């Protein structure tokens, strides 16, 4: 489609309609120092073959996990995605569907979401799941706001190491809604200091939040954290890696009131950070406070099963000040990916993926710890991710390993800490793990 610019007279008419005399007056609130003071350096117009060649050259400069052995984690993991997933979600009835407002003509989409919700409830050991949130970080932030709404309290305690990006999103949500800042519990050996946590949690705390496994990969003492939370009448919020639940206990089994998670490991590609999937589940007593969409099963007038959007308490449906949340969309396609992934793998398949990831991670951790100059930063148990102290800056190590066609891990210096965060999935072979260790041992300081 060609771009047809507005004329000078049309621009003048639009400016007059909104009550300003010039474009500069329209953008007066934008500091002059941050405005571009030169003409845009645009390419000349290109035909389709030229555009294709240009984009292919640009794309060729990327380094991806199809060509490099990846040990990157920190929230996005290189798990295998069965080809059947793309085939199913690419069907036009799924791929083009948006909000199923008209239930009578959206039964297929609604049933797919209902099946996703059912799978999340089984996986997390909870009673109700919504149709999804934007991502794991926004799901956690919404969970905390929900806890504050339920309890009438204004503080949140973070037990253990929460992903820094999630912490940033949570702070943004709380500051924008006028709530108090986050209280961070102390850490011991990479996870929550239980004694310190007990002293922190009181009758002013709305929620205690824990990530399982935490950002460092360490497994938190979730049962003890849950007990401390409930002693003070607070809401226990768990952000659990869904794939880890193939081998770890479900949040519902150790008392989580709200359990959320980042659904990327369930069939979504890493995709340079998104789009991802926010999982949100609750216990039955909190169902009327749940944010986002919720699909329910009902009977039509002929007695046949049907699916509808139910308990719609978002700002689109009721007064904004009475709404449980102002979220106005969900990640239905990514939720479908997760449902297809779990359906294809089944219970045993998920257990095998989780077990292989854990076993290979521990094999690699032991091998790296035996190298001169390398050591594990924490002794706490972990799932498929761990932190290594290195004999050189992690950034330098990562740079050298890229030359060996390996992504060595995530540099914690990004967050002002020492160490290299390494993740291992079921995709890594023993040959790749051994080659990684050999490459590390040959590095130059």
Swiss-Prot record:
EC number per UniProt: 1.4.4.2
Record's catalysed reaction(s): N(6)-[(R)-lipoyl]-L-lysyl-[glycine-cleavage complex H protein] + glycine + H(+) = N(6)-[(R)-S(8)-aminomethyldihydrolipoyl]-L-lysyl-[glycine-cleavage complex H protein] + CO2
Keyword Amino-acid biosynthesis applies: no
Family indicated by similarity: Belongs to the GcvP family. N-terminal subunit subfamily.
InterPro entries the UniProt entry points to: GcvPA, GDC-P_N, GDC_P, PyrdxlP-dep_Trfase, PyrdxlP-dep_Trfase_major, PyrdxlP-dep_Trfase_small
Gene3D superfamilies: Aspartate Aminotransferase, domain 1 (3.90.1150.10), Type I PLP-dependent aspartate aminotransferase-like (Major domain) (3.40.640.10)
Keywords: Oxidoreductase
GO biological process: glycine decarboxylation via glycine cleavage system; nucleoside metabolic process
Entry function: The glycine cleavage system catalyzes the degradation of glycine. The P protein binds the alpha-amino group of glycine through its pyridoxal phosphate cofactor; CO(2) is released and the remaining methylamine moiety is then transferred to the lipoamide cofactor of the H protein.
Name by which UniProt lists this protein: Probable glycine dehydrogenase (decarboxylating) subunit 1
Assembly information from the UniProt record: The glycine cleavage system is composed of four proteins: P, T, L and H. In this organism, the P 'protein' is a heterodimer of two subunits.
One example GO MF annotation: glycine dehydrogenase (decarboxylating) activity
CDD domains assigned: GDC-P (cd00613)
Key word Oxidoreductase present: yes
Organism: Chlorobium chlorochromatii (strain CaD3)
């Amino acid at each position: 489609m060609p771009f047809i610019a507005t004329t000078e007279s049309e621009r003048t008419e639009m400016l007059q309609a909104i009550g300003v005399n010039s474009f500069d007056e329209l953008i007066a609130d934008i500091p002059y120092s941050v405005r571009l003071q030169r003409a845009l350096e645009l390419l000349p117009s290109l035909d389709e073959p030229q555009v294709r060649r240009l984009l292919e050259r640009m794309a060729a400069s990327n380094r991806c996990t199809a060509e490099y052995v990846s040990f990157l984690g920190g929230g996005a993991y290189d798990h295998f995605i069965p080809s059947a997933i793309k085939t199913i979600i690419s069907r036009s009835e799924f791929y083009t569907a948006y909000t199923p407002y008209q239930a009578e003509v959206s039964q297929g989409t609604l049933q797919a979401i209902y099946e996703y919700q059912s799978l999340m409830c089984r996986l997390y050991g909870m009673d109700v799941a919504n149709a999804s949130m934007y991502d794991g970080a926004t799901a956690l932030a919404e969970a905390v706001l929900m806890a504050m709404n339920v309890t009438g309290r204004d503080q949140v305690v973070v037990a253990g190491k929460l992903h820094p990006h999630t912490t940033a999103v949570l702070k943004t949500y709380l500051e924008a809604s006028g709530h108090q800042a986050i209280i961070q519990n102390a850490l011991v050996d990479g996870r929550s200091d239980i004694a310190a946590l007990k002293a922190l949690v009181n009758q002013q705390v709305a929620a205690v939040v824990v990530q399982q496994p935490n950002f460092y990969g360490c497994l938190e003492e979730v049962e003890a954290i849950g007990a401390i939370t409930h002693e003070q009448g607070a809401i226990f919020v768990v952000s659990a890696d869904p794939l880890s639940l193939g081998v770890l206990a479900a949040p519902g089994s150790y008392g989580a009131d709200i359990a959320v998670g980042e659904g990327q490991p369930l069939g979504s590609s890493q995709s340079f950070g998104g789009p991802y999937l926010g999982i949100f589940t609750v216990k039955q007593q909190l169902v009327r406070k749940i944010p986002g969409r919720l699909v329910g099963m009902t009977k039509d007038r002929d007695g046949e099963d049907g699916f509808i959007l139910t308990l719609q308490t978002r700002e689109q449906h009721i007064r904004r000040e009475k709404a449980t949340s102002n979220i106005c969309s969900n990640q239905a396609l990514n939720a479908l990916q997760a449902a297809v992934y779990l359906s294809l793998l089944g219970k045993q398949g998920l257990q095998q993926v989780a077990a292989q990831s854990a076993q290979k991670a521990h094999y690699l951790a032991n091998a790296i710890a035996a190298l001169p100059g390398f050591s594990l930063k924490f002794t706490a148990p972990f799932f498929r991710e761990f932190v290594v102290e290195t004999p050189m800056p992690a950034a330098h190590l990562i740079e050298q390993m890229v030359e060996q066609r390996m992504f060595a891990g995530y540099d914690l210096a990004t967050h002002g800490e020492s160490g290299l965060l390494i993740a291992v999935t079921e995709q890594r072979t023993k040959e790749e793990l051994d080659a990684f260790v050999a490459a590390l041992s040959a590095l130059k300081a």
